[in-house]
Amino acid sequence: MLANINDNSTLVQLIDMRGINTSRMKNAHHMFWTKEGLTKHIDLSEFDTSNLEDAGYMFSTPYETVSTAQIDPIDFSHFNTSKVKIMTGMFAGSYLPSIDIRNFDTRNVVDMQYTFAGLKNVRHLDLHGFDVSKVNNIGAIFSGNSTLVSLNLANWQLDSIHAMDSLFAGMHALTDLNLTGFTTKNVTDMHHMFTECHALTTLDLSSFDTSKVTDMNNMFRDNFALKNLNLSSFNTSNVTNMKEMFRHDGVIYPLDVSTFDTRKVTNMDGMFYWTLMSPENATLDISNFDTRSLTSALGMFNYTKAKTIYASDQFTVNNVAPHPHEMFITNTNLVGGNGTQYVWPNNSSQYAHIDAPGNPGYFTRKP
C-alpha cells in the first residue's frame, strides 16, 4: 500500500498525510523513498501506523544521491511502531537533519539491517532503551556514518545476535559511544567491530560478554585517538583469531590485556603493530599469554615504541610457520630483561622469549 509514492520526484515541498486513512496499512516499504530528489516536509501528525508491520526503507534515500537541499525533521511523536517487524534500511541514506525516535516501540522488530546506514546529516542519535530482544539481524546497521558524533545504545539486549562484525566500522567522527548495558552473550564474530573510529578517545566495553566469540581480528584497528579502552570483562577463551586486533592504536595506554585467555589463538599477526607509540618507553604486559596454539605471529610487535614487554615461559613460538619469521620491526626502544637491546636484523621469532644470559631475547619476566 502506497509504496514508492515519492519515486522519481525532484524536490517536493510537502507531503501531507492528513485525512488519509491508513489504519489498516501493514506495508509501507519504500513509502517515502525517492531516487531523484528530496522532500522538504513530511507531515505525519495524523498518520495511523497502528497496524504497520513493514517499514523497510520507508524514509530512505539512495546512498549515491547528492543534494544540498535543506529538509525539515520529521515529527515521529505519534508514530506507532508496536507491530512493526521490519525496519530494514528505514532511514538509510537519509538527509534528515535529526532523527528523534525515542518513543519507538521496537519489541517486535526482527530485522534492523542497514536501518541507520549512510545518514548524511545526523550528528546525534539516541536509541537507548530500545527493546531489541527479538532482533536477529543488525548487519551494517550504522555503516557509512561518517558524520555521526554521538550514539547512545545503552541497555540494548541483543540476545539473538551472533555476528557483530564491522558494527561500528568507519564512524570517523564518533566521539561518544554509550554501550552501558549492551549485551553480547551469544555473539561469536566481532571482527572489525570498531575499525576506523578515528575520533573516539574512550571506549568502555565492561558490559561485554565475549565468552562465545571466536574472531576478534582487526577489532580495534585504526582507532588513532583512542586513549582509554576498558576490556576488563573480556573472556577470550574461545578466540582463535586476534590478527591486527590493536593495529595503529598508537595512544592507548595502558593497554590492559590481563584478562585475555589466548590458549586457542592461532593468529596474532600484527596484533600490536604500531601500538604504544605515545608515551614512548611504555610497558606491554602479556605475561598471561599462553600461545600453545599459535601458528602465525608475523609482525606481531612491529613499530611499537614500548621499552619493556612482560611475558612468561608460556609464550612459545614453537608452532609458528615458517620459523623463524619476522616479529619485531623497528622496535628501537625495546630492551629485554637481561639488557638485550633491539638491533637490526635481529627481528625474528627467535627473540620472542625471556631475555637470559647466553640466550638473548626481547621479553622480560614480570617481577
Language-model segments: which ranges?
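Negatively charged
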Residues: 1-367
